[in-house]
Amino acid sequence: MKKAIIIGAGPAGLTAAYQLLKETDIHPIIIEESEFIGGISRTAEYKGNRMDLGGHRFFSKNEQVNDIWKELMPLQGAPAKDDLMLGREKPLAEGGPDPEQTDEVTLIRTRVSRIFFLRKFFDYPISMKPETFINMGFVRTMKAGFGYLYSCVVKRKENSLEDFYINRFGRPLYSMFFEDYTEKLWGVHPSKIAPDWGAQRVKELSLGKVIADFLRHLFNPNYKTDSTSLIEQFMYPKQGPGQLWEKMASEIEKMGGEIYFGQKATAVLTENGQISGITCTRVTNGGSAQEKLTGEQTTYTGDYYFSTMPVKDLVLSMGDTVPAKVHDIAKELPSRDFITVGLLVNKLLIKNLTKMKTVNNIVPDCWIYIQERDVRIGRLQIFNNWSPYMPAHNEDTVWMGLEYFCSEGDDMWNMSSEDFIKFAISELVKIDIVKEEDVLDATHIRVKKAYPAYFGTYKDFDQVESYLSSFDNLFCLGRNGQHRYNNMDHSMLTAIEAVNAIKAGSTDKTAIWNVNTEKEYHEEKEA
């Protein structure tokens, strides 16, 4: 029986194993550096409170991806706890499981995300509501309007992410809502970032699109938007994203696949234009800031190799056989790391002034983009609104994730957990979101290489891609495996395309690398 060695137990690696088992006779072996399933899409747990590291909506325009999700965890057939408490109506799947009776169920949730700027809330994406103009004030509103009109007439050549945003929103709105947040996220100014990230993350969204959607809603209340960034509902596993990936891992093992933890790929062996093996070193606390190599090594050999490890690490682990130019480009590929603080509080200072009903009338947001320039926090997750089953006590506490973007080794990364938690709390107090005396508990998690970055040597990445594609039995998948800011569904699609190539006996990797770049993956989902 042929074997496939898969580096990484995140969405891409798991999907590769799952598809191989369902559609081929190839035996998959997954080697995972950490002790967790799901990669950055895992669900962390602290004293019964569950954390989604970054916020992961389950929505895809690809029906095969949607079918896999539903196959693993079917849609709810009865109301969730908070919907029952509030009398809210949600679409239900006929014959679907009851989330009050079973855990293996996917909920349908309402997407609410807003921007916190000037100590006020703005819809994200920016909407045409009167509140938007009131909060912006007359002068800012006029500047934004004229700036957008100017951007419609005078188009900039898109050499940077700054150009991309200005062309779609105008300079005043870009300065208000994109410039500072983007610099927080990447650590460099948008003028120094390639426009690719905007094309992949914002895609077809622009102020013109927002206006068009507003007018369609105005004259046709039943109109459904087709822009991914505007989708109003999404699927979400009852206990967070990691629950689904853990279910997939369980199914993989039931079908005969193998998963090994604490295995850090430290050497990729090559021979005659093929990958011939992966040497792993046993680690403790794999993937964390406290990671330690034990020295115990194991070499895994197979017929096919799937890599979801960071491209930089993959190339450097290939040794001196890599061309110098490719080595140098890969070595300097930038990425951003991530810190999240799980914060449990009695209540929030910010009030729910919307018409949306919530438990204890907390703000309805799943996540909030913090645009205030006097703090370093980037995003705030409110896990109660993702799923009422994420907090241990949804009825009387608010469980949040305070998200910071950083670089391994910088001042934030090197802070002790205790100091960082104090710092994060002080920032929420500063911008009037919580009172310090309302804090009940907190935890602190670091995540390495969460965001592949689009500056530095990224401009020459095609040379690295070409080199890696020259190995017929190597398939690079997922966010880190392709150095591309993919969503979960895109990561899954790279795995699906790779398995399709193997089934077809093809060594052409074009379709795999084109996921989330070609128009076919941006097509509107048909009704």
Pin down the residues of each PLM region.
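N-terminal Rossmann-like FAD-binding beta1-loop-alpha1 element of flavoenzymes
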Residues: 2-30
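Conserved flavin/dinucleotide-binding core of flavoenzymes
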Residues: 43, 126, 361-366, 374-527
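Active-site/ligand-binding neighborhood in enzyme catalytic cores
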Residues: 130-132, 136-271, 276, 282-289
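Glycine-rich FAD pyrophosphate-binding loop
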Residues: 21-46
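Mid-domain catalytic core of redox enzymes
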Residues: 23, 237, 261-419, 423-432, ...
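Short, well-ordered coil/turn residues at beta-beta hairpins
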Residues: 61, 167-168, 308-309
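Conserved Rossmann-like nucleotide-cofactor binding loop
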Residues: 12, 36, 312
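Dinucleotide-binding Rossmann-like beta1-alpha1 core, especially the glycine-rich loop
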Residues: 47-152
